[in-house]
From Swiss-Prot:
Name under which the protein is recorded: Uncharacterized mitochondrial protein ymf28
Top-level lineage group: Eukaryota
Subcellular location: Mitochondrion
GO cellular component assignments: mitochondrion
Principal subcellular localisation of the protein: mitochondrion
Taxonomic placement: Eukaryota, Viridiplantae, Streptophyta, Embryophyta, Marchantiophyta
Keywords: Mitochondrion
Originating species: Marchantia polymorpha (Common liverwort)
């Protein structure tokens, strides 16, 4: 049973199998209690906010990296170079590809970028404020 403990809801403090997904984005050094698979949600008075932080904001480094790679630098899949102006580049890397030509895709990428930029600080700063409110309340 120890092999399947990351899918055990009770041993994971209520998160369940989602912590297996969230473990992909966290290094074990960022986690205070064991690895991320063993941590789950810590038991705090603001239990729900703490869980929502890890569930919603953990994939954001991967999302930002994907947006940067595909929209900012104009990266294309390898197959798109086979029949176009360029042959398949042997130096595949971010920034080595053609620039986006579709105006709609560029506008959509800018919209997504600024949407993440505008929404992320509100969600991020609302998470530790509950701890500071608790400290004021306890003092």
């Amino acid at each position: 049973m120890d092999k399947y403990k990351i899918f055990d809801v009770d041993r994971n403090n209520g998160i369940g199998a989602r912590s297996a997904i969230m473990g992909l984005y966290h290094h074990p050094s960022m986690v205070h209690r064991g690895t991320f698979y063993e941590k789950g949600c810590p038991v705090t008075p603001d239990h729900d906010k703490y869980c929502i932080y890890f569930i919603i904001y953990t994939p954001e480094p991967l999302i930002i990296r994907t947006l940067t790679a595909h929209f900012v630098s104009g990266a294309r899949p390898r197959e798109w170079f086979l029949g176009g102006w360029c042959s398949t580049p042997r130096h595949i890397g971010i920034g080595q590809h053609s620039v986006l030509a579709n105006r709609g895709v560029r506008i959509l990428s800018l919209f997504l970028f600024f949407e993440v930029l505008a929404y992320y600080p509100f969600g991020f700063f609302s998470w530790p404020n509950s701890w500071s409110n608790q400290k004021w309340f306890l003092i």
